[in-house]
Amino acid sequence: MSRLQNDTFLRALLRQPTDYTPLWMMRQAGRYLPEYCETRRRAGSFLDLCKSPALACEVTLQPLARYDLDAAILFSDILTVPDAMGLGLYFAEGEGPRFERPLRDEWEIRNLVAPDPHAELQYVMDAVAEIRRALGGSVPLIGFSGSPWTLACYMVEGGSSDDYRRIKTMAYTRPDLLHHVLRVTADSVVAYLNAQIESGAQAVMVFDSWGGVLSEAAYREFSLPYLERVVAGLIRERDGERIPSIVFTKGGGLWLESIAAIGCDAVGLDWTMDIGRARALVGDKVALQGNLDPAILFAPPETIATEAKRVLDAFGPHPGHVFNLGHGISQFTPPEAVSVLVDTVHQHSRKLRGGR
C-alpha cells in the first residue's frame, strides 16, 4: 500500500498537532452531486450500486475529485449487515429501506447468527481494497458500520420508524430478547469492521443514528454497553499504524462524557451541542468530530463561512478536531456551498494556528 501523502485526519483523531483542521462530510458521496446521480442511474438500483465494488469505488472518489477533502469514506449502507443475516433488505419507492423478514418472533431472534464478512459481505471488502488502491495514498479511507442499537431498530421495526414502537416494546417487555439481538449484532459489527480494516480501512466509524431516541436509562442499557463491546473488539493497529475509531450518537450530547470513556479515539457531535463546551467536558481524553448544522449549507456563502468559523473558534487551536457536519449532507445541498465550506475550514484553521 502507498504511504499516505495527507495523514492530517488520522493525526487529528489521535490528538496530534496538525497545521490545519481536517475536514470530511458524512454522506459526502451522495445525491447532491450530479455525477453521483449519473452513476446511480447506471447502477440500476441503490443496492446494485452498493454491491458493485467498481461503482462503489467510483462514487467514493467523486467528492475527492471536486473538493480538497482530508479523508474518503467507503460508499456502502449500514444495513448490509442485517441483510447478510438473512433479513432480506430492499428499498421501497418513497419509503426507504425495508426488511422482508424483520425480527418479530422469539424463534427468529434465537436463531440469529453473526454473518461471516468474508463470505456474505465480501463485496464490501472488495470495494474497500479497490478504493485503497485507487486513492494511491492521497488521503485515508474510513470504514464504517451502524451501531448495534441502530441496526436493531431497523431489524425489529422492519424499516424506518417514527415512534420505535416495536423495539421499545421489546426493550420494556422482553429485554432478554433485545439483549440477545444486540449481542449478536455487536459481534457482527466487530467482525465486519475488522474485516474492513484487514481489507485496507485506515480508520473506522460507528454510526449510532438512533441512540438519541432512548431515555437516559435505556441508552445506558441498550446502546452504550454495546458500543463499548464493539470498540473493545476492534483491531487497534495494522502494519505498524494505529487504526483510530470514531463513535457518533445522533442526539447523544447528554452522554458525551460516557461515550468518551468507552475506549474510542474520537466522538462525533451533532449540531445541537456547542463544541467548545464539549471539549471542556472531555478535555484531552478523545478527539471531537463535527459539528456544523447541515442546513447551513443552504445559506449564502458569507453565512456558511461565518458559521464554519464559529465552530472552529469554539474548539480553538487545539489538537484533536476533525471538522464535519452534525449529520449527513442533504441531497438538496448546492455543490458550490461545499467548496465555500472546505476553503473556509482550511484557511481559517491555519490562521488559528498562526499560519497563513
From Swiss-Prot:
Function as written in the Swiss-Prot or TrEMBL entry: Catalyzes the decarboxylation of four acetate groups of uroporphyrinogen-III to yield coproporphyrinogen-III.
Catalysis performed (reactions): uroporphyrinogen III + 4 H(+) = coproporphyrinogen III + 4 CO2
Quaternary context: Homodimer.
Site (described: Transition state stabilizer): 77
Protein name per Swiss-Prot or TrEMBL: Uroporphyrinogen decarboxylase
Sites where the protein binds substrate: 27-31, 77, 154, 209, 327
Gene this protein is translated from: hemE
EC number assigned by the record: 4.1.1.37
Compartments (UniProt record): Cytoplasm
UniProt record similarity statement: Belongs to the uroporphyrinogen decarboxylase family.
Superkingdom of origin: Bacteria
Pathway: Porphyrin-containing compound metabolism; protoporphyrin-IX biosynthesis; coproporphyrinogen-III from 5-aminolevulinate: step 4/4
Lineage: Bacteria, Pseudomonadati, Pseudomonadota, Betaproteobacteria, Rhodocyclales
One cellular component (GO) term of this entry: cytosol
Signal sequence annotation: none
Organism: Aromatoleum aromaticum (strain DSM 19018 / LMG 30748 / EbN1) (Azoarcus sp. (strain EbN1))
Keywords: Cytoplasm, Decarboxylase, Lyase, Porphyrin biosynthesis
A GO molecular function held by the record: uroporphyrinogen decarboxylase activity
